[in-house]
């Protein structure tokens, strides 16, 4: 059975979810001082849900809507992704925060993983996407807990036919054939580096190409070597589908990776080698991803909040 919905089915699902969220928010727009429709969506990556602590707790307090309550939304099943929409204000700017994202490897279709963006676009107001992720470092200069501002991407599943815009086009949102040569907004990237300097963050902030793979397995040595040869600086299992759909909707995009582990590109141990490299060397785990997310989380939170003050 095809997982591709026709335009009417997509629109029906989007409209139903948007109506549910709007009904929850409407009383707050009417009765809460300074509660405004969000202009920016922030998506929190693995272990980076602490960004929500930067939401104003009063004037106005945040409004939380669990994914599982919203028609058509899927619940995140991955540790480090709580699964809530949070509407509020960050550094004086109205925002909606996805505390936990959806992944294809959880069994979701690409329409389902990017569904929140379609819904928020239908509701209006949101025009910016700030997306964060935990990624493996491919570039030899990158170390665990470094940061990388994404300026381009490699969409490996997309090149093989698994693309978020595959199927009937939603003409009201964007064009059938979308140009992505400048998917990551230059002015927002400049703003990120400006705030990094102003905050005097000691953690390195690189600029590079993110490679999207479907997961859930971490990369083999040969795959990591291939990605490096193709020009990838980091690799992860998210972000690119959301970026593509946001650009399809005409949003500006800023994307930030936290390098939580370094990928192994050396050849595997040989059965003919009398002193092989230990097999455990360089092996990535999700626990490592979450732990390094905690280590760097304060810098990520402060950086995102500083950027929000300019939006």
UniProtKB/Swiss-Prot annotation:
Instruction: Identify the residues that bind phosphate.
Output: 46, 81, 101-103, 134, 238
Instruction: Name the residues that bind a purine D-ribonucleoside.
Output: 219, 261
Q: Which SUPFAM superfamilies match?
A: Purine and uridine phosphorylases (SSF53167)
Is Phosphoprotein one of the keywords UniProt gives this record? yes
Regions crossing the membrane? none
Entry annotated with the keyword Glycosyltransferase: yes
Q: Name one GO cellular component term.
A: cytoplasm
Q: What sort of enzyme, by top EC class, is this?
A: transferase
Concerning PANTHER family, the annotation shows:
METHYLTHIOADENOSINE/PURINE NUCLEOSIDE PHOSPHORYLASE, PURINE NUCLEOSIDE PHOSPHORYLASE-RELATED
So what family is this one in? Belongs to the PNP/MTAP phosphorylase family.
Q: What is this protein called?
A: Purine nucleoside phosphorylase
| Species of origin | Saccharomyces cerevisiae (strain ATCC 204508 / S288c) (Baker's yeast)
Q: Which gene encodes it?
A: PNP1
